[in-house]
């Protein structure tokens, strides 16, 4: 399964870890993905891998669940 946001397509990017002596070694910057249940526009519920920036910006609507009446 790809480490990619299913909403915006954000994917891992390569970069460098830079030490104090300015030596560079390669590393990966990965998106902060969360598995959430999402309510789709047609009303169905689907589990998706979504980055936190999409959750915070409101691009997806989280499924809250059934509320039981007491």
From Swiss-Prot:
SUPFAM superfamilies named in the record: L28p-like
Claim: Ribosomal protein is one of the keywords in the record: yes
Classification via Pfam families: Ribosomal_L28
Signal peptide (from-to): none
GO biological process annotation, one example: translation
InterPro entries: Bacterial_rp_bL28 (IPR050096), Ribosomal_bL28 (IPR026569), Ribosomal_bL28/bL31-like_sf (IPR034704), Ribosomal_bL28_bact-type (IPR001383), Ribosomal_bL28_sf (IPR037147)
GO cellular component: ribonucleoprotein complex; ribosome
Keywords, sorted A to Z: Ribonucleoprotein, Ribosomal protein
Region annotated Disordered, chain positions: 1-26
Molecular-function annotations in GO: structural constituent of ribosome
Entry's family note: Belongs to the bacterial ribosomal protein bL28 family.
Name of protein: Large ribosomal subunit protein bL28
The encoding gene: rpmB
